[in-house]
């Protein structure tokens, strides 16, 4: 009898079907070693997943027989009176649906001001199974579970051993012929590549339909059903459905099993759903990062690691509603961030702070509006691909949007200046962006722009406006962002007007108390111009311009919306430059 320590699942479909199979295999091998403290790790490689055991396992009939008693995924009872196979633990979909419906009605009554009775909690799995049910995936998994439980013990054992041996030898599970060979329907919610599409090799008369069941390997689908109970989640996007699967980069089954209870944020828009799913995973990892290092099975981001070193991505499949059907319309992958690694406990706190702040800022964006949808798109590109230029473009565009939002007296949220500085410093210490934000001229000009825009907007709202509000300044900087001379002209003209207003205010007040602003010096402008000279590339110039808007539109270090805490400065006859 052969002993095996490593097993392989290829990335054949290019979808989350491969991930589901790899996670399912991880759980199966963990169970075959008795569960409990058994350590089974799944690692993502370029073209496959490798599932590794702490100790080699001998595959034989007696060992795998445990899978017949517990096929490792739930039988879902969707109709009153429906019974699960003997010995298996069912998931009561009917009862959980009744509780979910009660919650929905309770929310309506709460809005009407009525008192509410205490309700039982809905299982986090219900909302996943609900979407699987809509996508017609429950029948296939229930049917296979029934066949596994009812199979002849020796035939099932021989089949499982043969399939696992094939995976251990780097072959496909479908290459191992077995006497136990149930037919499994091709279901797109578990395997998006078998969804509606062109399946013939030639163009003449190509039919649109699912992959025939004869081409679907029952063991691979079994692994996917197991994996779906661990890492599959979803969102309703209007009448459409978006399913998500967490991709392990390097995680043990105990890592993954805790995801079964993770309740992802629920939103009804696609881009925001992607972003919040990543945020939820990062916060989940950071909450576990302070577990003692000696517990090798526990969830933690090790020293020197970033979130992407544990979970590489969230794979998605979008099912578009066409009335009576919801065919697959888009397959994508959203990477987890690798902004900076956790080097000490303080970094865990910073991660949490950044994520919560960014979540709050993005929450107000309405994806149904073109400008705000583009903001979310830029942020998602940054989050998924560590695309810092997209983030800078997001910050610049967000500054413009928030100015208009404030003037319309609509709620808005801003980034905190200190947090932005920390994010850039911790994540990009070797890149020019740190040199830019530490430049004294840049800092002083950004502060002056903030005083002439968001600070004076705040003063206007309080009935204390003194200076002109430069409403179009952010947009003008954004328009000229790629052109060094034109950008410098915009900044120079602003400084000239800013200093003129300050001088006129000083003349009006003379030695009387009142709110003043400090002028921008020629030295500041010179340092900013030299900064542009050091980074003459168009993208670099654009990055500096976007950073200028970002730091001009963010909150001060105290977390206040403006610098009005500095208002009504006592008169001084000392000329102090910013």
Please give the residue ranges for each predicted region:
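Basic, glycine-/proline-tolerant helical and adjacent loop/strand elements
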Residues: 103-275
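Domain-exit/linker segments immediately C-terminal to small folded modules
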Residues: 194-372
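Hydrophobic, Leu/Ile/Phe/Ala-enriched alpha-helical segments that form helix-helix packing faces
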Residues: 29, 164, 168, 285-290
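Long, contiguous all-alpha helical interaction modules
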Residues: 1-138, 302-578
């Amino acid at each position: 009898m052969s002993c095996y320590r490593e097993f392989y699942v290829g990335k054949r479909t290019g979808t989350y079907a491969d991930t589901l199979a790899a996670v399912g295999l991880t759980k199966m091998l963990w169970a075959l070693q008795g569960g409990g403290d058994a350590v089974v790790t799944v690692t993502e490689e370029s073209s496959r997943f490798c599932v590794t055991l702490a100790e080699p396992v001998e595959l034989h009939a007696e060992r795998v027989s445990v899978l017949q008693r517990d096929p490792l995924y739930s039988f879902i009872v969707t109709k009153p009176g429906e019974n699960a196979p003997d010995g298996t633990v069912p998931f009561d979909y009917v009862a959980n649906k009744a509780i979910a419906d009660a919650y929905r009605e309770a929310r309506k009554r709460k809005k009407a001001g009525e008192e509410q009775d205490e309700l039982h909690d809905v299982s986090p799995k219900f909302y996943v199974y609900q979407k699987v049910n809509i996508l017609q995936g429950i029948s296939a998994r229930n049917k296979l579970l029934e066949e596994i439980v009812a199979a002849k013990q020796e035939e099932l054992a021989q089949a499982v051993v043969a399939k696992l041996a094939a995976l251990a030898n780097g072959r496909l599970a479908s290459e191992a012929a077995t006497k136990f060979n149930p037919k499994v329907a091709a279901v797109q919610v578990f395997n998006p590549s078998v969804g509606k599409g062109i399946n013939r090799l030639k163009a003449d008369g190509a039919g649109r339909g699912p992959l025939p069941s004869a081409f679907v390997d029952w063991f691979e689908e079994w692994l996917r059903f197991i994996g779906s109970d661990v890492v599959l989640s979803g969102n309703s996007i209007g009448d459409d459905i978006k399913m998500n699967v967490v991709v392990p980069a390097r995680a043990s089954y105990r890592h993954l099993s805790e995801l079964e209870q993770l309740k992802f944020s629920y939103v009804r828009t696609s881009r925001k759903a992607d972003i919040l799913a990543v945020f939820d995973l990062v916060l989940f990892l950071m909450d576990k990062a302070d577990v003692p290092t000696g517990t090798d099975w526990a969830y933690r981001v090790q020293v020197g690691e970033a979130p992407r070193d544990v979970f590489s991505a969230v794979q998605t499949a979008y099912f578009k509603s066409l009335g009576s059907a919801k065919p697959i319309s888009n397959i994508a992958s959203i990477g987890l961030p690798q902004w900076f690694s956790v080097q000490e406990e303080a970094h865990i706190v910073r991660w949490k702070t950044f994520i919560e702040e960014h979540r709050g800022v993005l929450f107000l964006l309405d994806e149904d509006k073109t400008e705000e949808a583009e903001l979310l798109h830029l942020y998602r590109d940054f989050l998924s691909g560590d695309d810092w230029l997209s983030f800078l473009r997001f910050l610049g565009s967000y500054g413009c949007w928030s100015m208009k939002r404030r003037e319309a007296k609509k709620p808005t949220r801003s980034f905190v200046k200190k947090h932005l500085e920390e994010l850039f410093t911790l994540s990009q210490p070797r890149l020019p962006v740190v040199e830019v934000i530490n430049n004294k001229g840049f800092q002083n000009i950004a502060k002056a722009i903030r005083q002439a825009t968001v600070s004076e907007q705040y003063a206007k709202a309080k009935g204390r406006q003194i200076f002109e509000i430069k409403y179009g300044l952010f947009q003008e900087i954004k328009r000229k962002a790629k052109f060094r001379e034109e950008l410098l002209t915009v900044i120079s003209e602003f400084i000239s007007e800013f200093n003129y207003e300050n001088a006129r205010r000083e003349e009006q007040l003379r030695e009387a108390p009142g709110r003043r602003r400090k002028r921008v010096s020629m030295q500041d402008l010179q340092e900013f111009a030299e900064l542009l000279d050091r980074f003459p590339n168009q993208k670099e110039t654009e990055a500096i311009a976007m950073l200028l808007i970002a730091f001009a539109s963010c909150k001060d270090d105290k977390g206040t919306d403006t610098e009005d805490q500095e208002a009504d400065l006592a008169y001084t006859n000392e000329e102090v430059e910013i």
